[in-house]
Amino acid sequence: MAFDKDAIIASLKDATILDLADLVSAIEEEFNVSAAAPVAAAGAADGAAAAKSEFDVELTSAGTAKVKVIKAVREATGLGLKEAKDLVDNAPSVVKEGLSEDDANALKESLEATGASVTVK
């Protein structure tokens, strides 16, 4: 059985979007396939399996020694006094982003030593 590609392409050009959607559905049913792109599914699986390399340190609570926490935040971030105080007052807030795991854990330990509650995400 021979077919004329040009004739098929010409009839596809003349078809409406609804006709083309029906055609795709019919082809999926006839050949038991899906029109979904397999690349997208594989890409999502690769992203979930990849190890996390950047971490964010989030101050969840300043605790009772707020002044010590503000000083520690200033040292870690280089922020001014007002900015560091605002960050601590508005907890939960991100202290630093994009750190390596070791740096994030070191910052977490130094902030927790001042009495703050900290999470690494």
Swiss-Prot record:
GO cellular component, one term: cytosolic large ribosomal subunit
One Pfam family per UniProt: Ribosomal_L12
GO molecular function: mRNA binding; structural constituent of ribosome
Keywords: Ribonucleoprotein, Ribosomal protein
Domain of life: Bacteria
GO BP, sorted A to Z: translation
UniProt family annotation: Belongs to the bacterial ribosomal protein bL12 family.
Subunit structure, interactors included: Homodimer. Part of the ribosomal stalk of the 50S ribosomal subunit. Forms a multimeric L10(L12)X complex, where L10 forms an elongated spine to which 2 to 4 L12 dimers bind in a sequential fashion. Binds GTP-bound translation factors.
Function: Forms part of the ribosomal stalk which helps the ribosome interact with GTP-bound translation factors. Is thus essential for accurate translation.
Annotated protein name in UniProt: Large ribosomal subunit protein bL12
Species annotation: Leuconostoc mesenteroides subsp. mesenteroides (strain ATCC 8293 / DSM 20343 / BCRC 11652 / CCM 1803 / JCM 6124 / NCDO 523 / NBRC 100496 / NCIMB 8023 / NCTC 12954 / NRRL B-1118 / 37Y)
